[in-house]
Amino acid sequence: IVEGLAFLQPDSYITEVAEERVELGTMGWDITPSPDEYAPIADYLSARAEAVPSRGLARFTQAFRAQYYQLAKRVLQEQTQVIPCQAGWASGHIAPNGDVWSCCIRAEPVGNVRETGYDLRPIWFEQVGDMQGMRRSIAGRECACPMANASYANMLLHGPTVARVGWRVVGR
């Protein structure tokens, strides 16, 4: 697929592991590849990301992408948070009905902005709802996923990953 779309000459692209997600209407579809199915794809995508000639910020982007594909591969293989997840701290989601989720994979409401006058702060700062319980669950590694959006936030807040990316960029 990647090579078939090369004629479009995109400056950049990203792929993401298909997952069952409430907001995408894919629950029960069994679309997530097995670790064995995804591993060679992740290796291929990482190698392509590292081989792309790039300068400036694009070098960092490609280095983070190469790291993301390997992280996603490990999450699928190990079925655990390979690096700590920051969902509910670094990111959150508001569903169309006003439910606040720490993460769209779990899609578990921790509050509803309709009940707080559309003010996120009481929910986010744990004055109402159960954001504290969700954060505790996530920190306790009770979940794991390879979702790109969450993974990039997690990688940016994970010192060893940032150091690896920096080393790849400087060492290239």
Regions found by a protein language model. Give the residues of each.
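Radical SAM enzyme [4Fe-4S]-AdoMet core and its adjacent flexible, acidic
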Residues: 1-101, 105-115, 157-158
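Flexible mid-to-C-terminal extensions adjoining Fe-S/redox cofactors in radical SAM and related proteins
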Residues: 80-82, 99-172
